[in-house]
Structure formats: structure tokens, C-alpha cells
């Protein structure tokens, strides 16, 4: 997997991986701004990767960023392993570099953002994961810019 400064221009897609849903965000490396894109609400592998293939075809990203789920203290758990596997599959299937980014608290932040604009309860579900992906990507941009 590339380091955080491997791409300097072009479209970037980010993923908030979950067993049931995958949030997707998009941004331009040069602008360093992330935006929520969509949520893939599917637990089966084949339909998930078909949707991702459609997004990659449409947006032609130069880099993919996958949120790496870890405990608050940084230790890994079952979902961490699944996130790493998902990242390897993306890189292998689409031949696009993949970076891993810390995703701690992104769902909490996304929930808070939605509550601030009056979206609560079950109404959050369709947007929550893509906003979490947006925060993953924005953090990636912020950290990669700070490192350069």
C-alpha cells in the first residue's frame, strides 16, 4: 500500500467499510476537499464490487482510501482484518493504489453532523456511512498535506 503522499493530483475515492454497508466519498487531491458520494447498501461481495466498479468507471480515481477500523487505543479487532482484506481486494481487482486511513470516531462525527442539520434516528442510515467516508477522506487529505 502506498504512503500518504503517493498521489498529488486526480480524483480520490474513499470507503468506510462495514459488513452491511460501505460509505463512499469523493475528492480531488489538488483541492483537498472531500464530499459524500453514496452508500453501497449490500452485504454480498459480488454486488458490492460491481457497484464499486461502476464508481471507478465513472470517476476514474487515481487513488482509493480505505478507513481502517481500530479500537480507540489503536489495537486491531475483527473489522480491522476485514478492512485490510477489502483494501487488498480493491487494489488487486482494480489495479489502483490503495491507502489505509485511521477511521476512529468517524461514525460518531458523522452522526453529530447529521444531528446538527436535523437528521436524526433512522433517517441518518442512508447518509451516515458516506459522511463517515467523507471524514476519512478529509482527514487523509489534511494529513497528507501536512506531511508534504
From Swiss-Prot:
One of the record's GO molecular function terms: nuclease activity
Enzyme Commission designation: 3.1.-.-
An example Gene Ontology CC term for this record: cytosol
Entry keyword annotation includes Hydrolase: yes
Pfam families documented for this protein: RuvX
UniProt KW keywords: Cytoplasm, Hydrolase, Nuclease, Ribosome biogenesis
GO biological process: rRNA 5'-end processing
SUPFAM superfamilies with a match to the protein in the record: Ribonuclease H-like (SSF53098)
SMART domains assigned: YqgFc
Highest taxon listed in the record's lineage: Bacteria
Annotated localization: Cytoplasm
Keyword set includes Glycoprotein: no
Enzyme class per UniProt: hydrolase
Functional description taken from the UniProt entry: Could be a nuclease involved in processing of the 5'-end of pre-16S rRNA.
Family: Belongs to the YqgF nuclease family.
Name of the protein in its database record: Putative pre-16S rRNA nuclease
Organism listed in the record: Nitrosomonas europaea (strain ATCC 19718 / CIP 103999 / KCTC 2705 / NBRC 14298)
Amino acid at each position: 500500500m502506498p504512503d500518504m503522499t503517493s498521489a498529488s493530483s486526480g480524483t480520490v475515492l474513499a470507503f468506510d467499510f462495514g459488513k452491511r454497508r460501505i460509505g463512499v466519498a469523493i475528492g480531488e487531491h489538488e483541492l483537498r476537499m472531500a464530499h459524500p458520494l453514496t452508500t453501497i447498501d449490500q452485504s454480498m461481495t459480488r454486488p458490492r464490487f460491481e457497484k464499486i466498479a461502476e464508481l471507478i468507471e465513472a470517476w476514474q480515481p487515481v487513488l482509493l482510501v480505505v478507513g481502517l477500523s481500530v479500537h480507540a487505543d489503536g489495537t486491531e479487532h475483527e473489522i480491522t482484518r476485514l478492512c485490510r482484506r477489502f483494501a487488498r481486494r480493491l487494489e488487486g481487482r482494480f489495479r489502483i493504489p490503495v491507502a489505509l486511513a485511521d477511521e476512529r470516531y468517524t461514525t460518531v462525527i458523522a452522526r453529530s453532523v447529521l444531528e446538527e442539520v436535523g437528521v436524526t434516528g433512522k433517517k441518518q442510515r442512508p447518509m451516515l456511512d458516506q459522511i463517515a467516508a467523507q471524514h476519512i477522506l478529509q482527514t487523509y487529505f489534511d494529513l497528507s498535506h501536512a506531511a508534504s
